[in-house]
Amino acid sequence: MAVSKNGKYLYSIEDEGVAVFKRDKNGDLSRINSVNIDGMRGCFLSTDVDGKYLYVAGYHDGKVTVVHTHKDGRLGSLMDGVFHTGLGSVAERNFRPHVNCVRPTPDNKYLCAVDNGIDQVKIYRVNKLRNKLELVDILRCPRESGPRIISFSMMVSLLIFSLNSVMRSGLTNMMEAVRFRRLN
């Protein structure tokens, strides 16, 4: 689930898409609408800094999906969807892409897609004029590290792996992610 930037709407994953609910003063939820994401069920949601897009991570199909959102809370059309390709290094993950987490950088310039299956973080630019995700960089994580979640704060960017290590940077610009160092 994810909450809109204004706190009025709750986004949720459904079998083949995403739904949005309006939160009333009592905390009750009323469904507004839903959209199909043209892929398998997502596993992680986030919104951009401006609240104009909903990002969906697809673990089962390795897909990153972007959905337009409207000021009145409605979900709009699909902006773009990108399937990751490649082979991973851990047999238990079936050697294929599994997008675990999608989150925009704090400056809203890039979308980071953490892929547990292929040990990578793909960094996209959201081209709002062309309605496309454009791959601008790839952070290749150590083999079998299983990156899971990326998180940002004002001072630190964290990339969390399969419960055994964390990569940390004092830089908030993910384009400098290559300078991350592994901490055990």
Regions found by a protein language model. Give the residues of each.
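Short loop/turn segments immediately following beta-strands, especially the blade-tip
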Residues: F21-D28, V66-G76, Y124-K132, T172-R182
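Residue-level detector of Asp-centered blade-edge/turn motifs that repeat once per structural unit
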Residues: V3-G7, V49-D50, P106-D107, M154-V156
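Structural signal for beta-propeller blades
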Residues: V18-V20, G62-T65, D119-V121, M167-S169
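Asp-box/WD-like beta-propeller blade repeats and closely related beta-sheet repeat scaffolds
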Residues: R31-C101
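Acidic, glycine-rich loop-and-beta core segments that form the ion-binding/anion-interacting portion
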Residues: I138-N184
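Short loop/turn segments immediately following the C-termini of beta-strands
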Residues: D15, Y59, T69, N116-G117, ...
